């Protein structure tokens, strides 16, 4: 990845516009319920302030209607929380492209402000050129640090970087890309990927891409049911996609053709209903009844997969292998989590459900790298080019798109 890095750019006295991903969950009362993304941005913010920059932070929050102020999507709670974490006043600036510009002109070296939700600006999602130029005019240096939105070509993530005097990657973005590159571009072998979730259709391109790269492709959740069906077993009334059986068979064949494999469950945990209170039964995959729903992998499968993970050199994890929110069907995901934690492999995990599972089983400090990106993490796994990263690479080469 050939990009200019923030740490290599002189920032003292410069107006520095940093795009972070501060899109945090909030409850109905407007209180932040998980500040992981805010905390992840702190090293970048502190480094810019320590350099004597005049720091302006940009982010989106939620999906408000463009061009309309919506109190529920205001970054005011984020600015207040940043004030607490940084131990200093972090004002929120509204209408920052127009009337609020006067406030930005008053910034001194070492000051920091939060700019109100970028999605209140008409043209943000369409990467509008005029809007991008107005944003770029606010700064001497643009820092793209939001890996979680790097897969979106929008004005605040992509367009602004094309027109800013200097465009560079922030430490968080650099760390994310370095970790993903280490896992996929030159991995320590064996490389094991865990791809789970409810539907094959949503992760088909990822499965196909990884089948060519990995030594073992572990499938779980509803995705595994389609693969079990592809192997000739019944899955009862489980969530599965029968029309994608040929795709599943092709993925298995592709993995085996290059010496890899897709290890399928030998036993599963089933129930008659998708419910926390439904009685759970463990059975062989040959014994799934017509009215059964597969809701987790069984203990034999968990042991087999655990052994594979403990011997891995690199692990990429996206998705829980069962309905881990229900304790009766959490055993498989817990076993996977424990195996990842105990493995000496370089491990990277991403996706909301995966991170929730990591937190539930308290292995945060045992995973080498936990990605802050959901969609961006998946698109990187697919082998897609992330627009914001492509823009930074083009700027580093001295070209514009």
Swiss-Prot record:
Record pathway: Carbohydrate degradation; glycolysis; pyruvate from D-glyceraldehyde 3-phosphate: step 2/5
Superkingdom of origin organism: Bacteria
GO cellular component term, pick one: cytosol
Residues noted as binding ATP in the record, renumbered to the chain: 203, 325, 351-354
Annotated compartments: Cytoplasm
SUPFAM superfamilies, per the entry: Phosphoglycerate kinase (SSF53748)
Coiled-coil intervals: none
A molecular function (GO) term: phosphoglycerate kinase activity
GO BP of this protein: gluconeogenesis; glycolytic process
Pfam families for this protein: PGK
Name of the molecule in the record: Phosphoglycerate kinase
Gene: pgk
């Amino acid at each position: 990845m050939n990009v200019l890095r923030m740490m290599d750019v002189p920032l003292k006295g410069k107006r520095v516009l940093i795009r972070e991903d501060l899109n945090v969950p909030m409850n109905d009362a407007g209180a932040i319920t998980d500040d992981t993304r805010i905390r992840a941005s702190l090293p970048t913010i502190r480094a810019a302030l320590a350099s004597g920059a005049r720091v302006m932070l940009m982010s989106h929050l939620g999906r408000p209607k463009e061009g309309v102020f919506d109190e529920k999507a205001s970054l005011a709670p984020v600015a207040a929380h940043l004030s607490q974490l940084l131990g200093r006043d972090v004002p929120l600036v509204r209408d920052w492209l127009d009337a609020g510009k006067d406030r930005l002109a008053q910034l001194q070296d070492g000051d920091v402000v939060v700019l109100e939700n970028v999605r209140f600006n008409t043209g943000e999602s369409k990467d509008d050129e005029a809007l991008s130029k107005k944003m770029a005019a606010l700064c001497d240096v643009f820092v793209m640090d939001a890996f979680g939105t790097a897969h979106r070509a929008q004005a605040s993530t992509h367009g602004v970087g094309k027109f800013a005097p200097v465009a560079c990657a922030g430490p968080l973005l650099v760390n994310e890309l370095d970790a993903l590159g280490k896992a996929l571009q030159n991995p320590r072998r064996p490389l094991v990927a865990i791809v789970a979730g409810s539907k094959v259709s949503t992760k088909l391109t990822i499965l196909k891409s990884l089948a060519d790269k990995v030594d073992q492709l572990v499938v779980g959740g509803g995705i595994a049911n389609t693969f079990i069906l592809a192997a000739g077993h019944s899955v009862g009334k489980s969530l599965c996609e029968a029309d994608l059986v040929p795709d599943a068979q092709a993925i298995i064949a592709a993995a085996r053709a290059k010496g890899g494999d897709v290890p399928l469950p030998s036993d599963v945990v089933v129930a008659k209903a998708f419910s926390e209170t439904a009685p759970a039964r463990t059975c062989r995959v040959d014994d799934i009844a017509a009215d059964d729903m597969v809701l987790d992998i069984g203990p034999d499968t968990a042991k087999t997969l655990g052994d594979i993970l403990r011997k891995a050199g690199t692990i990429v994890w996206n998705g829980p292998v069962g309905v881990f929110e229900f304790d009766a069907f959490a055993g498989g995901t817990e076993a996977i989590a424990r195996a990842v934690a105990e493995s000496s492999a370089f491990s990277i995990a991403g996706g909301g459900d995966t991170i929730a599972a990591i937190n539930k089983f308290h292995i945060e400090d045992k995973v080498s790298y936990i990605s802050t990106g959901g969609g961006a993490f998946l698109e990187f796994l697919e082998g897609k080019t992330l627009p914001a990263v492509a823009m930074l690479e083009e700027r580093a080469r001295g070209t514009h798109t």
